[in-house]
A protein has these predicted regions:
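C-terminal extensions of enzymes
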Residues: 8-10, 235-265
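Conserved anion-binding
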Residues: 102-163, 167, 172, 197-213
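Active-site mouth loops of central-metabolism enzymes
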Residues: 8-29, 74-86, 148-161, 217-228
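Active-site-adjacent beta->alpha loops and helix N-cap segments on the catalytic face
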Residues: 53-66, 83-90, 109-139, 159-161, ...
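Acidic (Asp/Glu)-rich catalytic clusters
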Residues: 2-6, 32-40, 60-72, 92-100, ...
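Hydrophobic faces of well-ordered beta-strands that scaffold small-molecule active sites
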Residues: 8-16, 43-47, 75-79, 103-105, ...
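Catalytic-face loop-and-helix region of soluble metabolic enzyme cores
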Residues: 198-245
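Catalytic domains of carbohydrate-active enzymes, especially glycoside hydrolases
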Residues: 30-48, 169-178
Length: 265
């Protein structure tokens, strides 16, 4: 992952089609076009896992069914705890077969429609529910040496709580960090960088002009009419965090993608 930072390789978020879509063929074409654009430009395609708790096709499943090419260090699959054990292994086996080595392991957004891994499924004792910590530990045990796994860091949670969770995540096998989205320099992220100087850190940049949507991530209301320029903010993030990678969430492929070749110099 440090290779991505040193070579200024953006992580670009791609959402797979929702299973409830009424235009599956069109959505699959959109997914393919975005994936190929990212791959051919040498960046890393980061494919979400039931984002916002909405049931979607799985990233590795889409890649395999569509016959898309995989470059091992240019794909990262998000993986959360809202799966059956059988489905979890299907995903991991598919990633292994395709040569996908990067996983972002998160607890995830749940809903009543989604199954949830149980402690017994992952051999976890003395816990009431499975979090990213138990999932990391399980994958490391069942697939030793196969995957390089990252975890989320939320600078909007109480710092003591978040740093304790991060400590447990690294003990379970995490090797890199991706933050929640920021739009300005963040003191908690600065503290995290001081605590983990040798760990690759990827800063998530919010690329949607709908700044009000970010309220759900940061935990406080951001008025929709707040002035916000995603590209200018991205450039500032690079200035504030020159030794970190950047994950582009909700990137506009038509209007913004052509611009990012000039934002990381």
């Amino acid at each position: 992952m440090q290779h991505h930072i040193q070579n200024k390789i953006y992580h670009v978020e791609i959402l797979p089609p929702k299973q409830a879509t009424e235009k599956l063929r069109e959505d699959l074409k959109t997914f393919t076009d975005k994936y190929e654009k990212v791959r051919q430009s040498g960046r890393c395609a980061c494919i979400t896992d039931n984002a916002m708790g909405l049931l979607a096709f799985q990233g590795a499943e889409c890649i395999e069914e569509l016959g898309l090419a995989v470059s091992g260090d240019q794909v990262m699959i998000h993986l959360n705890t809202f799966h059956t054990k059988e489905n979890l292994h299907e995903i991991l086996d598919s990633c292994k077969k395709l040569g996908i080595k990067y996983l972002l392991v998160v607890s995830g957004d749940g809903s009543d429609r989604l199954p949830k891994l149980q402690p017994a499924d992952v051999g976890a004792e003395h816990v009431q529910s499975v979090t990213s910590v138990e999932l990391l530990r399980y994958i490391n045990r069942e697939y030793p040496g196969v995957f390089t796994m990252g975890v989320a860091f939320n600078p909007y949670e109480p710092p003591e709580h978040e740093f304790e969770k991060l400590k447990r995540k690294f003990a379970a096998g995490a090797s890199f960090i991706i933050t929640q989205p920021i739009i300005e320099k963040n003191a908690v992220i600065d503290e995290m960088l001081q605590k983990y100087p040798g760990v690759p850190v990827i800063i998530e940049a919010w690329m949607s002009k709908k700044i009000g949507l970010l309220s759900e991530a940061v935990g406080y209301t951001i008025p929709e009419d707040t002035p916000f320029d995603p590209i200018a903010t991205l450039k500032q993030i690079h200035r504030d965090y020159p030794n970190c990678g950047v994950y582009l969430s909700l990137l506009g492929f038509k209007t913004q993608y052509p611009l990012i070749s000039e934002t990381w110099k």
